[in-house]
Amino acid sequence: MSKEILNTNGEKLGEIKLNAEVFGVEPNLHVMHLALRRQLNNARQGSACAKTRAEVSGGGKKPWKQKGTGRARAGSLRSPLFVGGGVVFGPKPRSFEINMPQKARKLALKSALSAREEQIVVVKDFSAITEPKTKLMAGIIKSLELSGKILVIADTMAEENKNLSLAAGNIPSVKLLLPSNLNVKDLLEADFVVMTEKAVNVITERLQ
């Protein structure tokens, strides 16, 4: 399987062969689901905290005598029955982290790439962005006939892509990603995936 390599004007420069073991596998929906769940869970802060009746300040004194008032008996104003009292079984700080074997994580990425294979656009590089200006990136999007959510995978540290981050920063529908940060969530959310030729090679080497 192969893809055309385009310049940023949408003109064909050549072809690149995509590794079928990375871009042509049968998408495994279950493994992709597990990877997505892991990614979302691992992003959770897990710092929610509510105080129990033992942790709320005050409430040490019995509010009224046990008998003779006509009221229900009470031992503390910090009981969960009172406003301002402690919370029963409230949240406590905890880790939501989920582990996943490396082999399964790789399969999830391969599945996501294969599921998006038809929406992948390969460009040589972004050296045409000579200045960090939004209009240059907007022009490239128009030339490549892209729409919706666009995921751009490129090494923004490379000399030929040095202006890419600033040029794309003000376009809400464009998300930049380093090849090393490739993840299932961003791949599945994107309508188009734009990769540089170098990024394709880096991803292939990492996943095969």
Model-assigned labels for residue ranges:
Residues 47-53:
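Short coil/turn segments at secondary-structure boundaries
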